[in-house]
Amino acid sequence: MSALLPVFQQTSTLRDGQTIPLWAGPAPGALGTEESDIPAITVFLPRTMTQNTPAMIVCPGGGYVNLAANHEGRQVANYLNSLGLAAFVLRYRLGPRYHHPIELGDAQRAIRTLRSKAGEWRLDPGRIGIMGFSAGGHLAMSASTHFDSGVASAADIVDRSGSRPDFTVLGYPVISMTEPWTHQGSKNSLLGTNPDPELAKSLSGEVAVTKETPPTFIFQTNADTTVPAENSVYYYLALRKAGVPAEMHIFEKGAHGVGLANDDPALSEWSKVLANWLRGRGIIK
């Protein structure tokens, strides 16, 4: 893996396995200079890159306190590569050291970075998605419901690009930050132990959806006792009510945090169903 280099010190050609910090200097709100203080994306490239390759930012879960960077990061990125997508695993900052809006800002910056560098990196600026699992699913959902079109006059060229993802993929996501369906550990890590109720509500996907929320694919298991399936169900219903194209698959069996679930013949089908959804939306061939 290459040394960490700020995004604007990278060459125009991406290298598989390189890790790219999202800011040239200290990230906004940084509390130190350790790796955990430096949000970054790690690059995973498909065997063949076209001039307009679709891309996916992958947000591993971990309760907003750890990152499951292998089975919800690298392994997923490799699978996305097999479908022809360039994948970028996001290392976002975590609680309890960091709280909202730091995590959301890191995800938004990743989207802006890919869009602003699309020409140089041979990415399609109109096919940039975000994907997340568990708490990383909450982050991906938050980026899909809280975005802007960029600031044309911004001194930082990355900030001139919009932060809305073009499509969203959620695996057993934390959606709600309110009772009774929230995952309390994720909520505490993101918002602290006594958050403003209105802030918690605003970060609950079931009420944050608008008609501008990107098309969304969701998978979940009915047997998940860590993040109840109601998180996915109520988010899907909110998407449906807003007229947002959405597809949800709830599998009967399967624990939380399974990633690709390669050891489960039934649950592992979710990744194949996702591939069909991506093809149906014209994201991959």
Located regions from the model:
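N-terminal cap/lid segment of alpha/beta-hydrolase-fold proteins
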Residues: 8-50
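Catalytic nucleophile-loop/oxyanion-hole region of alpha/beta-hydrolase
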Residues: 68-70, 74-76, 90-125, 261-269
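Active-site glycine-rich loops that stabilize anionic/oxyanionic intermediates
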Residues: 60-65, 222
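Short beta-strand element of the alpha/beta-hydrolase
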Residues: 52-61
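Active-site nucleophile elbow and catalytic-triad environment of alpha/beta-hydrolase enzymes
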Residues: 39, 154-158, 193-208, 213-214
